[in-house]
């Protein structure tokens, strides 16, 4: 009897061993990049899995036999593979091709985890490395480049700031590898020019209100993703030199640029090191006249130093360190002269401006990141420590009593702990949960260079736990839902306001601690079954302490004394975004579309009160739509187009009134054609942009002038040209022309009269001739 029992136990263990085989694998695209979020099935069974952030999957406890493994996902061509299971685990690595680059593109910003665009129920624009490489041959101004490529984003101002630029009519949060660059406590509009384009691998733009990264993303997020190491070589590099200048009047307009990059992987180490130096010349308009130096891109010295090193501890663990230094300073030999809004532009004449030089003396960014793909079963961990130290100086102005330059300093220290757990309950319910906590200390102030305190030091401490669920329901419905709890403590010292413009100043304000608590939500649903029609609907909220510094510096004297807690309106803004949209892929044709509504009970518009720009906290409603389309006519010929419309109103004393031009931009349309007439030798790109008109306001009867942001905007069109000739795989010569047909125009913000001194023409035709050598 004992022998029978022993034999039975042995047979049972043997059977269990036979029934416990696993299929392990990894799925990559044609560039060997991991593809997350793909669904893996064994036909005829209930076995299923989802690839994790690194493209890995495991099908557990598969009985011996022959099966068909199916890998599928939005934006990729389905792969079917015959597999046979015997007595051992097997490994099956696959490569999948994209059926639509737009849907298959991997994004990390939207959900703080690697996922494809086709699995995100919101509007996303990605500017790829190829686009950046091509269009930076026309202009290295990232501000202008984004305006030409992102529907819903205001066209660039042709200056060193993004004043008046919005994403879907609201402020946006700018980041570098997730490190916030924006200064929402005192918005200086210098966050877009915070890094050189040479070290950006791609740009991810998440549209619509979101709180996933905290304060300031009422219109969305723009995240600059920095370059990664070359994993195929121990040592590689690229040298890029170029010269640029005006085609309307070359005198004093010539500039130069040199950039050097080294990269490679040595055993478990990988590295990227880069340095860039650029000197721009004088900018001229279409008639050859010198453009006014006010916040100009002309005569700027730009320096960028970048380094990133990584170490793979083992197959699951990695540590990575990044640092970037950016500096841009203007060495102007011209000063502003003349000009009258609506009649003649402000121009540049030889002279020396009093006060300090304008520009950004430094912007330091660094992070230390630890990642573990499997901290415990089905769960990955990312821990990120980051730091930013930013200092920028504005132009000299007699706006301040006795004259002076104001500056903004911002010091940020942060910690992010992010976990992701995948789950596979059944073929009809699987997905992942991302959760963690953000800790941020942001210290921002706006002094004058001479030491006077224009805006006092604001010391914000932010603690925010969050959770984000992504689940496939009945295979084809993708549900995303999440929440974030903002716990903010803002300390402001006692201060006395200074005189500027028509504001008398001299108001003593009692400081204090301002606490904020807010719970924000998001939810979205996407139907992923059909490539030709992939619709989504979503709701999301953002949390913002918009430009609190501007409010503080305008404190009014009241009975009993002014205080940050009592007499100054410092309420936070909660913005709600409602959106419905779709993506489509039919053979060589692809398209996207979205309609959105954005509301807030408190506004962020500026109004002119006695010559002083003052925040107006009125309820707002913004709505708009966006469309994109592309067609691959030939392997070497593609065409893409986009169109965006946005409009908004706020509550006024006599009903609804339109939002100013500093918030709402005219309609924008683009048409891009890329053609390679000589295979692997010659590339040509033609990029057209149309900016429409917006004339919503009348002259102020009291001043017989246009209020700030109320100027009538007329339409204009611009065409840019890119050409590149590849002598071989290592050497390329490029020629880019900005404003090819030398259009004579005023940028949108100049026409809107966003500021009294911004009636400045856009640049005339400019060339950029460069040589790139890779080794």
Language model segments and positions:
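Membrane-embedded beta-barrel scaffold of Gram-negative outer-membrane proteins
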Residues: 378-398, 526-528, 534-544, 550-553, ...
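Gram-negative outer-membrane beta-barrel transporters
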Residues: 240, 440, 475, 595-600, ...
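Short acidic/polar hinge/loop motifs at secondary-structure boundaries
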Residues: 60, 144, 179-207, 260
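Transmembrane beta-barrel wall of Gram-negative outer-membrane proteins
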Residues: 251-280, 289-333, 362, 425, ...
